[in-house]
């Protein structure tokens, strides 16, 4: 058992090192894209399933409340946070539409959709991205593995942050770190003189 624990930590560290080499440009581009959208008076919608939903909600909470420093609230909505709405849509046998319907109702030109999917193939996330495209929104996608179907939907203005791993647990860990990194970069760009 002790050896298994060491393997988990070693794999996580190796994935972090690989991501630190591969992802800075994409993370920087994503942060600047979000900052520009916010400066233009737009908002961020975030979505994901399971652990990805938790990461999407963490991002929205960090935007509205704060990340590490006190600052004005920033407009963000976690589309997975309203259980009544999700079950109402899902009850009508439209599970694939649980996020797309919200994107069509709440998303506007210039808004950002933060779409988080470990493998990039979750039908409801893919449908949300398709809806965001029709609303002329910009997509920031957190994926892993080979990016899945989601990666193929992205245009030149969109940003994919693809974790260099095939293991779901490692991808999810790196998604959380990436969300924290995005929050830090957004805060430090918009409010450069705030103290931690």
Curated annotation (Swiss-Prot):
Endpoints of the signal sequence: none
InterPro entries for the chain: DiaA (IPR023070), GmhA/DiaA (IPR035461), SIS_dom (IPR001347), SIS_dom_sf (IPR046348), SIS_GmhA/DiaA_subfam (IPR050099)
Record's function text: Required for the timely initiation of chromosomal replication via direct interactions with the DnaA initiator protein.
Keywords recorded for this protein, A-Z: DNA replication
Location of the SIS domain: 34-196
Keyword presence, ATP-binding: no
Family classification: Belongs to the SIS family. DiaA subfamily.
Gene that this polypeptide is encoded by: diaA
Subunit structure: Homotetramer; dimer of dimers.
Molecular function terms from GO: carbohydrate derivative binding
Keyword Cytoplasm part of the UniProt annotation: no
Protein name: DnaA initiator-associating protein DiaA
CDD domains assigned: SIS_GmhA
Gene Ontology BP terms: carbohydrate derivative metabolic process; DNA replication
């Amino acid at each position: 058992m002790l050896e298994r624990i060491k393997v988990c930590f070693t794999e996580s560290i190796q994935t972090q090192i690989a991501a630190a080499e591969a992802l800075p440009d994409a993370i920087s581009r994503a942060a600047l894209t979000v900052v520009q959208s916010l400066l233009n008076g737009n908002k961020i919608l975030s979505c994901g399933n399971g652990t990805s939903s938790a990461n999407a909600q963490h991002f929205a909470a960090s935007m509205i409340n704060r990340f590490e420093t006190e600052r004005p609230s920033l407009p963000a909505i976690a589309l997975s946070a309203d259980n009544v709405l999700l079950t109402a849509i899902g009850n009508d046998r439209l599970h694939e539409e649980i996020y797309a319907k919200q994107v069509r109702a709440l998303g506007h030109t210039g808004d950002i959709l933060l779409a988080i999917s470990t493998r990039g193939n979750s039908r409801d996330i893919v449908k949300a991205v398709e809806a965001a495209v029709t609303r002329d929104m910009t997509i920031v996608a957190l994926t892993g593995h080979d990016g899945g179907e989601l990666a193929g939907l992205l245009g030149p203005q969109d940003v994919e942050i693809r974790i260099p791993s095939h293991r779901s647990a490692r991808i999810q860990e790196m998604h959380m770190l990436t969300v924290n990194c995005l929050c830090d970069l957004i805060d430090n760009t918009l409010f450069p003189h705030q103290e931690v």
